[in-house]
Curated annotation (Swiss-Prot):
Principal place of residence: cytoplasm
InterPro entries per the UniProt record, alphabetical: PRA-CH (IPR026660), PRib_AMP_CycHydrolase_dom (IPR002496), PRib_AMP_CycHydrolase_sf (IPR038019)
Sample GO molecular function, one term: phosphoribosyl-AMP cyclohydrolase activity
Oligomeric form and interacting partners: Homodimer.
Places the protein is found: Cytoplasm
Cofactor info, note text: Binds 1 Mg(2+) ion per subunit.
Segments of this protein annotated with the region Disordered: 1-20
Swiss-Prot/TrEMBL GO biological process terms: L-histidine biosynthetic process
Name this polypeptide is given: Phosphoribosyl-AMP cyclohydrolase
Gene Ontology CC annotation, any one: cytoplasm
Originating organism: Sinorhizobium medicae (strain WSM419)
Amino acid sequence: MMTLTFASPPQNKSDLETGPAFTPRFDEKGLITAVVTDAGDGALLMVAHMNAEALALTLETGVAHYYSRSRRRLWKKGESSGNVQAVREIRTDCDQDAIWLKVSVAGHDATCHTGRRSCFYRTVGVDEGQAKLVITDDERHFDLKQVYAES
């Protein structure tokens, strides 16, 4: 249960950018963007969204929680796969409308639901005038059918 609450962002830009208060600026849907990297090697793992409850639970428990826009519900990362994200550090950007989580991933060391370490396993390029995707990391860290059989 969430006990932590967040004050409204200050009107003064200087206070927002240099003051000591963490006052996240949630968007009109009540969400803030979360960029997630590996605390050890800095690899980009995923981008997700948090509502106030997910952010508070993350701060209170030290385990990453997010808000699923497609499922419209709170979820603890790794609750199905076992790839729980232990939060090592949280940073916010200058105007507090995005956060950066540095995490250690338990389980299979995979963040993506496809079984890959990162959700960013494809590059975007142009081939014969068409935008194309190229898979650059096809290593699966777990068997999807086995891990998600009960989900």
